[in-house]
Amino acid sequence: MLDSKLLRGQLQEVADRLASRGFSLDVARIESLEERRKAVQTRTEQLQAERNARSKSIGQAKAKGEDIAPLMADVERMANELAAGKAELDAIQAELDSILLTIPNLPDASVPVGASEDDNVEVRRWGTPKAFDFEIKDHVALGEISRGLDFEAAAKLSGARFAVLRGPVARLHRALAQFMINLHTGEHGYEEHYTPYMVQAPALQGTGQLPKFEEDLFKITREGEADFYLIPTAEVSLTNLVAGEILDAKQLPLKLVAHTPCFRSEAGASGRDTRGMIRQHQFDKVEMVQVVEPSKSMEALEGLTANAERVLQLLELPYRVLALCTGDMGFGAVKTYDLEVWVPSQDKYREISSCSNCGDFQARRMQARWRNPETGKPELVHTLNGSGLAVGRTLVAVLENYQQADGSILVPEVLKPYMGGVEVIR
């Protein structure tokens, strides 16, 4: 959530910066509400001053033995007007707050300006896509050969956009997640967490999924009790661990990681990636979250992105890094890098990780703060998150990049310790 002071003092500048994201801020509505708020606030303050003066006059009139009934009536009238003014102020503020909850974050000055993914800027590449000397198969066909991927069985259970994994392919999927967690905890300094897969609405509001993106979520309604939502990412549960907290400077940076299933309705993805595991309603992901001092968040973003890249490097999977443009960034991001891995059957790079600096956007929603030792006062932290990595898409990349002419799959060297002696999946 943006600082409301920005809307009061720099409304047009904020509107211009949001326009670069393709977001049209209703300036007239905000100006109208702000004018009403100021007018009611001024009138309320005047009434309070008049009421205080009348109350003082009552004491003086009493001492003189004068009739205080007219003064008492005046005070009662003012009290009623004050109550009405407070109710109106609360209603105006609630409307302003509801607007604030739908406004995306302001892009950093270093973010390339653009309207869509076509305007993203490639920052670097790593590795060279393999030149196969046989006709390559996609991961669905490879999964059929090994009987390791079964989409028909999943459809019987749950419908479209689900998968059943079995045998060595299921083990490879588990190996990938274990490898990622071990790398991030052992070499990158993250603390592993196991968190709930269901959260309530305030947690999703804290990280920005609610109220704007409810249609993308799976909701569990319970009569007489608060609703649950299945997490779309462990970013929600990990980041909200600091909601309402005031952290000591020595606790920062916090580096948290979790391996969880993620659940998304893919409401806006009708007809896209309907084959295979690229876009699923349920998928596993290893998520990294950092909570840092504001002055260090851009540096932390580079480190977070490097942590995600290291997974791909050790798996020897070719990838590229993109700086997302203003029009393609996520709702809460100040700046985002996407990692895209090479998928041979599609002859292109596909997103496998998104690493974002959210500045104080989420922290303001959650009231997550740290005590600045220089001022002694609580201030908002900055939060970052990134996939390290999406496990299902990494499995797709491994199956396709490590395929052999007969449809078998070589196990990447770094995964062999997790595979119980299996070196080739047939």
From Swiss-Prot:
Question: Which sites bind ATP?
Answer: R264, S265, E266, E351, I352, S353, S354
Q: Which GO terms describe its molecular function?
A: ATP binding; serine-tRNA ligase activity
Q: Which family does it belong to?
A: Belongs to the class-II aminoacyl-tRNA synthetase family. Type-1 seryl-tRNA synthetase subfamily.
Q: Does the keyword RNA-binding apply?
A: no
Domains: entry comment: Consists of two distinct domains, a catalytic core and a N-terminal extension that is involved in tRNA binding.
Instruction: Quote the protein name from its UniProt record.
Output: Serine--tRNA ligase
Q: Which GO terms describe its biological process?
A: selenocysteine biosynthetic process; seryl-tRNA aminoacylation
Tell me the residue numbers annotated for binding L-serine.
Answer: T233, A234, E235, E287, S387
Q: Which reactions appear under catalytic activity for this entry?
A: tRNA(Ser) + L-serine + ATP = L-seryl-tRNA(Ser) + AMP + diphosphate + H(+); tRNA(Sec) + L-serine + ATP = L-seryl-tRNA(Sec) + AMP + diphosphate + H(+)
Location comes to: Cytoplasm
The pathway noted for it is: Aminoacyl-tRNA biosynthesis; selenocysteinyl-tRNA(Sec) biosynthesis; L-seryl-tRNA(Sec) from L-serine and tRNA(Sec): step 1/1
Subunit and partners: Homodimer. The tRNA molecule binds across the dimer.
Top EC class for this record: ligase
NCBIfam families per UniProt: serS
Biological role stated in the UniProt entry: Catalyzes the attachment of serine to tRNA(Ser). Is also able to aminoacylate tRNA(Sec) with serine, to form the misacylated tRNA L-seryl-tRNA(Sec), which will be further converted into selenocysteinyl-tRNA(Sec).
PROSITE patterns per the UniProt record, alphabetical: AA_TRNA_LIGASE_II
Question: Which UniProt keywords are present, listed alphabetically?
Answer: Aminoacyl-tRNA synthetase, ATP-binding, Cytoplasm, Ligase, Nucleotide-binding, Protein biosynthesis
The EC designation for this entry is 6.1.1.11
Gene label: serS
